[in-house]
Amino acid sequence: MSSFKGNQAQKRRLSVFPKGPLEIPSPTEADWPKDDEKDFVFKDLDQELDSLPQPYRMINKLVDHLFNRSWEIIEERDSLREVEKNWIVPAIYHPVAEIQLDKMPGGMAVSHDYLFIGGLKGFSIYNLHNCKRIYVLEKFKADVISIWATDLGNDVLIVPIDEMGIVRLFYLCKDSLYHIKAINEVDDSSKQSTCLKMEISQNGDFAAFLFQGAGDVWLEVYKLPKEIWLKEMEHPQSTLNQKKKAKQLQLSTPDSAVTESIETSSGPSVSSNSVQDLNISFKSDLKLSLPVFVMKIKPPKPIAGTTFKSPLEVFAKVEDYVGLGSGQNHFIKDVQWEQHMETFYASYKKHLEGEWEEEPLSMATFHFFYTNSLTTMSMDVKSSSGIACVLGIHWNGRHNLFFYSLNKTQKDKTEYENVWPCAAPIVMSQISSFSSYLALVCEDGVLILWDLAEGFLFGVVALPEGCFCQSIHFLRFFLVHEGQNVYPDYPVKFEVMCVVLCTDASLHLVTASGTQGPTSKVLVGRPVMHMEEAICAVAPVPALPGMVLIFSRSQSVTLMDVAKAEVLCAFSAPTCHPQALPWKPLFAVSPHHPYFLLHGAHPHGQTTSTEDPKKSTDSVFYFNFEDYLLLKDISKKCTISQMAVNFSQMLPVEKRCEQVFQKSIQMTKTQMKGREQWSRLRKYSIMLQKELLKR
């Protein structure tokens, strides 16, 4: 039995209406009371705290805030402890070899069994299997800052770019190195253009270079006569006789200028199938045929007003409807443009009062495609399979992807044959091997996936809000067989996989299969507490199915399995990079061999890194995946046949018997229903027959 005081206190707590219980209003609104609504709201049970005088009210709020914040920190620490308990430290693998350099390399490229490293006024060629330098060329006017290498069958096309922006073409055939041409080198330095970007088709049939000079930007496309080069090297004497009067190469390297280096590094175990070291020599007396100029492309001009006075005049004089509905070929009068600009300035005048920054030059992204259906080709033009036939290009800040046919001559006009418009400006694009798949990334974070070989749109997927694409990489399609990633050794269609690195350092896996549409999966989330773990670069590893290399700001390198979203191992190499600057890793992954090379630095007289890059020696560290126990089996057993896939999908006998039994039950039910329907139909027909007889 409770006391009287307790009952009184309970009544006071339950009394939340200031004026007693509310009366039931009459049905008509006119009879409702005119009292203020605040008289009927619930009282705040914590109002007594807000009624405290100052400074006690402020002290109470500060104490509450401090207590809540302390509780949040305690919860975060507990969650981190749980993660650390479950965290498995990955195996750390060290490099198997090291290439010591005199200075920081100006780019690296891998092709066939060779490694190319840009350096002091030239580049060096290394044997990829034993890391021995087999040739060095140092006759440029400036240091090389980037270098590319492309397979041309059994030969290699080498394209270095120096600090002056001059791009050169070299051809490596067996044990001979040839200089083909310096694409943009001129005698007058004031007219010298700079190469900003370049792209070579998959088989080396075409090359495109983006140049900048005299306040202008343009793209030049060349056809590479690689078949003619082979014939000229097979019959060098006839070639020399025909080109005896030609101008001598400006770049000549005498044999005495070529020096061999003695490597102090210990090489890895050389496999039995590795190539033998070649004595490469520079052939300065033989001049190969020059690349053939195809076309020059400039950025699209801004839309100007038309002189047509009416739409009828436009339809009467415009015969071509190419680009209809694509945002091109607009006919807008000058008056309309003036009205549009006046409205714009009136709306955003306060934002435009400051100083205007100089508009940057247009930059372009371009790719070579092998699908004829992207352009309208003439019937008499035939394109060989495996040869690039279309160039796709999009300019910064533009909504359109333009397609140009490569089956042109210098007399033809440089006009696009097709255009793909997008709802938002295209900020990035990427193609897969032999341009089978195309990915377009728009400014609004939308990713568009195309199967160009079949002319099929996989669909559109939107990245999470606030995520913007930093880089995108296609992965070769793989299967998970008995817990291991494997490549199918048979053709696969309508299957695409790619990894997307966003600007917030999150990593996503985007997959699409047939008509199901693309889906996105988070592999690595955005770092919140430890920003040094943020991802700065990603690289697929073709030798390991479903594996990607992840480079973090902390200068760590890990290998991730995208199927499980798990880190398998880490790679350790000495690095010497200032902590204040963001790390831009310089690396190269072999597309045909299980090799991976990373630039690093050794401090002088030490084995640990230092923050002073001037007190360190540059090196390129060599990693062979097959030398590591965890990755050896994955690299050697990376393919699976279609028969093995079908056999693994076969059901056991018990499952098959159960399926047959279930089907027989369903058939029995269907037969019973059919008999019932037939009996009802017979009864109904007999009843109708009796009714007819009565009439």
Swiss-Prot record:
Q: WD repeats at which positions? A: 421-460
Q: Which UniProt keywords apply?
A: WD repeat
- Look up keyword Oxidoreductase and say if it applies: no
Q: Name one Pfam family in it.
A: WDR93
The tissues where this chain's protein is expressed are given as:
Testis-specific. Expressed in spermatogonia, spermatocytes and spermatids.
| PANTHER family found in the cross-reference section | NADH-UBIQUINONE OXIDOREDUCTASE, WD REPEAT-CONTAINING PROTEIN 93
Q: What is this protein called?
A: WD repeat-containing protein 93
Could you give a single Gene Ontology term from the biological process aspect?
electron transport chain
> PROSITE patterns in the record, alphabetically?
WD_REPEATS_1 (PS00678)
Which residues does the annotated region (Disordered) include?
A: 1-35
**Metal-binding found in the keyword field:** no
Q: Which domain of life is it from?
A: Eukaryota
